[in-house]
From Swiss-Prot:
Protein name according to UniProt: Phytohormone-binding protein
PANTHER family: OS08G0374000 PROTEIN-RELATED, PHYTOHORMONE-BINDING PROTEIN
GO terms, molecular function: abscisic acid binding; protein phosphatase inhibitor activity; signaling receptor activity
Assigned keywords, A-Z: Gibberellin signaling pathway, Pathogenesis-related protein, Plant defense
Superkingdom as given in the UniProt entry: Eukaryota
Free-text function comment from the UniProt entry: Binds gibberellin A3 (GA3) in vitro.
Length: 156
């Protein structure tokens, strides 16, 4: 059964800049935002919308796995929502059978954005949930968003 974990953060960056970075510019931005973790991000198939397949290549020795393939399963420019589902590698190599992160961006003001994050996951064994806790994976996501904020504020 798929479980969900929700969290949110507020970033001091405008909605449009965040949306562009997390959607159409994701392959360029992620390696710059996480240069000590992500070697590169490549589009394997698609045009950036629903169904687009991405591969995130990690630097050797940093993560327990060296790559993660993801598919964009949600993409809505009106609600500024993007969902990325891991389909190979990454958390799936750590015992999860399903893992998806959905970001929804909402403007608070011209230079402030609320980011709602929903992590959906499933696993074969309760022992796996102890090993790959959603709170821990959400911390990684919030760390990424904080680094993204710094990157965009520094004139990216």
């Amino acid at each position: 059964m798929i479980k969900e974990f929700n969290t949110q953060t507020t970033l001091n960056v405008g909605l449009e800049a965040l949306w562009a970075a997390q959607s159409k510019d994701i392959t360029l931005v992620v390696p710059k935002v996480l240069p000590n973790i992500v070697k590169d991000v490549q589009v394997i198939e698609g045009d950036g919308g629903v169904g687009t397949k991405l591969i995130f290549n990690f630097l050797p020795g940093i993560a327990p796995v060296n790559y993660q393939r993801e598919v964009i399963t949600e993409y809505d420019e009106l609600s500024h929502t993007i969902g990325l589902q891991v389909v190979e590698g990454g958390y799936l190599n750590q015992g999860l059978s399903y893992y998806k992160t959905t970001f929804q961006f909402s403007a608070i003001s011209e230079n402030k954005t609320l980011v709602n994050v929903k992590i959906s996951y499933d696993h074969e064994s309760e022992l796996i949930e102890e090993k790959v806790k959603p709170t821990k994976t959400s911390e990684s996501t919030l760390f990424y968003l904080g680094q993204l904020e710094k990157f965009l504020l520094n004139g990216a």
